Amino acid sequence: MQLIQELSQARDRGLYQEVGKLTRELHNAIVDFQIDPHSPHAQEMSQIADATDRLSYVVEMTEKAANRTMDLVEQSAPLVNQLGDDSRELHQEWQRFMRREIDADGFRELAKRIEQFLVRSGENAGQLSSQLNDILLAQDYQDLTGQVIKRVTKLVTEVESNLVKLVWMAGQVDRYAGIEHDHVSMRHQAALERSAKGEGPQVAAEKREDVVSGQDDVDDLLSSLGF
């Protein structure tokens, strides 16, 4: 009995240390979230220290780029449609001319329309070129997005790996101690927890005493626990 109690205490201490270590590593990774200094938005991003805020910033940039792109496409579509309509009309008139169905006055009118079409086409082409260039520039957020998402993916992978090690360690201690768990009940409880609605983001967290309100509070809590 004493051996089982000692093993249980050792397990609890080990789990406590591993959870604290994992939390400290995760906290440090979130705070020290470095971005490539050559990124177009590196200077602006350097003012944002928290990874969560940086992800929110990326979402905001993505939304702005999407809106900008859609606006430019909406501005470009009428120009393209006009060029298509004018070219089809002129093509029909040119076919009539080739069949000698247009007299001299009609040909002079057609020549005038062709000249106007060429001038208008040049102007529209210049405007379309400018708008396409703006669309291209609006996509520069992708470099930053890729960096942040890759860092977050790496962070999540590391956390998952550490959690797997933690569960494995707990299982080994339980096996040596001869402790058996009701896995059916545990799976049922896990399913209930997954279906239950979470508390969600903390609203007015600064007015509550049971939650931490920022990375500084997390750091203070970990330090007070010896991690």
Curated annotation (Swiss-Prot):
Keyword Phosphoprotein: no
Pfam families: CheZ (PF04344)
EC number: 3.1.3.-
Disulfide linkage: none
Keywords from the UniProt entry: Chemotaxis, Cytoplasm, Flagellar rotation, Hydrolase, Protein phosphatase
One example GO MF annotation: phosphoprotein phosphatase activity
Record localization: Cytoplasm
InterPro entries: Chemotax_Pase_CheZ (IPR007439), CheZ_family_phosphatases (IPR050992)
Highest taxon, organism lineage: Bacteria
SUPFAM superfamilies with a match to the protein in the record: Chemotaxis phosphatase CheZ
Site note Enhances dephosphorylation of CheY-P, residues: 147
GO term, biological process aspect, one: bacterial-type flagellum-dependent swarming motility
Cellular component aspect of the GO annotation: bacterial-type flagellum; cytoplasm
Region (Disordered), start-end ranges: 194-217
The protein's enzyme class: hydrolase
Subunit structure comment from the entry: Homodimer.
Similarity annotation: Belongs to the CheZ family.
Record function comment: Plays an important role in bacterial chemotaxis signal transduction pathway by accelerating the dephosphorylation of phosphorylated CheY (CheY-P).
Protein name, per record: Protein phosphatase CheZ
Species the sequence originates in: Pseudomonas aeruginosa (strain ATCC 15692 / DSM 22644 / CIP 104116 / JCM 14847 / LMG 12228 / 1C / PRS 101 / PAO1)
High-level lineage: Bacteria, Pseudomonadati, Pseudomonadota, Gammaproteobacteria, Pseudomonadales
